[in-house]
Structures are given as structure tokens and as C-alpha cells.
Regions:
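Alpha-helical metal-binding/catalytic segments enriched in His/Glu/Asp
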Residues: 1-15, 54-58, 64, 69-89, ...
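Short, solvent-exposed amphipathic alpha-helical segments in soluble enzyme
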Residues: 24-27, 50-51, 73-74, 133-137
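Short, solvent-exposed loop/turn segments at secondary-structure boundaries
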Residues: 46-47, 68-70, 164-167
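Metal-dependent amide/peptide-bond hydrolase catalytic core
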Residues: 75-200
Length: 201
């Protein structure tokens, strides 16, 4: 049967988080759109992670180890202490479904300077904000222990859960579910454990 006009777009840079950077929504001219991505038959997703990155910088004091008593501050050890303050069950290897996490992606360290690079992910906005607050409070605790400015945390939000924008327009999701049923496919709503270009648009 007849249908409304369709628009199809390709975003080649989705996997590196830049697929939506040059996407001209006005020129695309659609009232709403769906992303077609890999997954199992019947998967329908309209929720993704809230995402942030965190860079933790630890400043130490390097002194000759032979005369280091009461004056050396080893940034690497404080970095390890910071990481140890984060819950062990909130790591990617211990989570699934709607469970969020903090993931240590990279670390570099010497006695004088150490850096930890994390990504923070959670579907729930309040839980997402609490995860970021934990980074701040861990740093505050260590600064109280070792001196102001020892630990710095730089947090940056990357993208948000598109569910917040979609929920007022659930007819879009229901239309997709009905289309799947019409094609003999049982829709299964699952959360995206990642991001998507749609969340950035």
C-alpha cells in the first residue's frame, strides 16, 4: 500500500562517536527516524547509556628514595588508592542489562605524576550523576588526606539517554513494534549498552 515519503541516511563514523557531527537534520527533513543497526531478530531499542569521561590526575613529589622519609609522595600509589575506592561490582565485566559502570580505560604513572582515564555509563540519569559525584568525593577525601590539589578530576559529559526525548512520543516506538508484528517478528525491547547516533541528534 501507499506510504509517506521516506528518507534514508548513512552515517559512516558511528563507531568512533562522530557519525552525527555533520548530519544536517533540517536537510534530511524527516519528522522522526529510526537507526538500523546490528542485533538479534526482534530487538527494539530506544534507551541508551548516559555517558561521561573522567580524567583523574594525581600529583606526587619525587625525592631520592634513600632520603624520602616523610617527604616523598608517590602519585602512582594514590592513583591506585583512588581506583580502589570505586565499587568493584560496578565494572563492565560485572554488569549487564540496565546496570551501569565505571571503566578504567587507560593509566600512566610515575612517582611525580599519574593519570587515570575512565568512562562512566548508566541508563538512569540520577544514578549517572551519583557515579560522577563519587569521583568528586573520592578526590576530596584523598585531598583531605594528602593535601589540597593532590588529586584533580576532570569530568565531561559525552551524550545522554535518548529515552528522555522519546518517552513523550511513544507512538514512534509503537509504530515500529506494530511494523515488526506485521512482518511476523515479535518485538523485544532491550536497552542499548552503548551509545548511538540517534542519542546525539
Amino acid at each position: 500500500g501507499a506510504h509517506a515519503s521516506l528518507r534514508i541516511g548513512f552515517t559512516p563514523d558511528e563507531e568512533i562517536g562522530r557519525g552525527a557531527d555533520r548530519f544536517d537534520l533540517a536537510h534530511f527533513g524527516a519528522d522522526y527516524a529510526y537507526t538500523v543497526d546490528g542485533g538479534t531478530l526482534g530487538e527494539l531499542e530506544y534507551e541508551n547509556f548516559n555517558a561521561a569521561s573522567a580524567v583523574v590526575t594525581v600529583h606526587g613529589r619525587n625525592v631520592h628514595p634513600g632520603s624520602a622519609k616523610r617527604c616523598m609522595i608517590n602519585a602512582q600509589l594514590i592513583a591506585m588508592e583512588f581506583h580502589g575506592m570505586l565499587p568493584v561490582h560496578d565494572r563492565p565485566e560485572a554488569t549487564e542489562g540496565y546496570e551501569g559502570f565505571s571503566h578504567l580505560c587507560a593509566m600512566q604513572g610515575e612517582v611525580e605524576l599519574a593519570t587515570l582515564e575512565y568512562i562512566i555509563r548508566d541508563h538512569d540519569r540520577a544514578s549517572f550523576e551519583a557515579r560522577k559525584a563519587l569521583f568528586e568525593s573520592a578526590a576530596a577525601f584523598l585531598n583531605a588526606k594528602y593535601g589540597a590539589g593532590t588529586v584533580e578530576v576532570a569530568l565531561r559529559d559525552s551524550y545522554y539517554n535518548m529515552r528522555e526525548k522519546i518517552e513523550p512520543h511513544m507512538a514512534i516506538v509503537e509504530a515500529a513494534q506494530q511494523a515488526m508484528r506485521d512482518a511476523g517478528v515479535t518485538p523485544r525491547v532491550v536497552p542499548i549498552r552503548g551509545g548511538t547516533d540517534g542519542a546525539r541528534l
